[in-house]
Regions:
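Positively charged, aromatic-enriched patches within helix-turn-helix-type DNA-binding elements
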Residues: 1-42, 46-67
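Intrinsically disordered, low-complexity protein-interaction/activation regions
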Residues: 49, 53, 71-79
Length: 79
């Protein structure tokens, strides 16, 4: 979907940066988004199913427990 692409583009532009759900909602959905904050989780899960070899053990889009999500830095992927 367009939102999944926007999420992937944002993560790829800033690898290693942790984004909170609020950061992602503000940036991708806009300040006027009145939906459920966990809609981010659904989009992340769908995106992982498309780009990860094993979405249950993500390498690229990582969960930072209690904070949000981050995209792995290139050096992490080659280690």
């Amino acid at each position: 979907t367009a939102k999944e692409f926007d999420l992937l583009a944002l993560f790829a532009q800033k690898p290693g940066r942790t984004f909170t759900r609020s950061d992602l909602l503000d940036t991708i959905w806009g300040y006027q988004f009145a939906g459920y904050e966990h809609t981010v989780n659904s989009h992340i899960n769908r995106l992982r199913s498309k780009i990860e070899d094993d979405p249950t053990h993500p390498i690229y889009i990582q969960t930072v427990w209690g904070v949000g999500y981050r995209f792995a830095e290139p050096e992490e992927l080659t280690a």
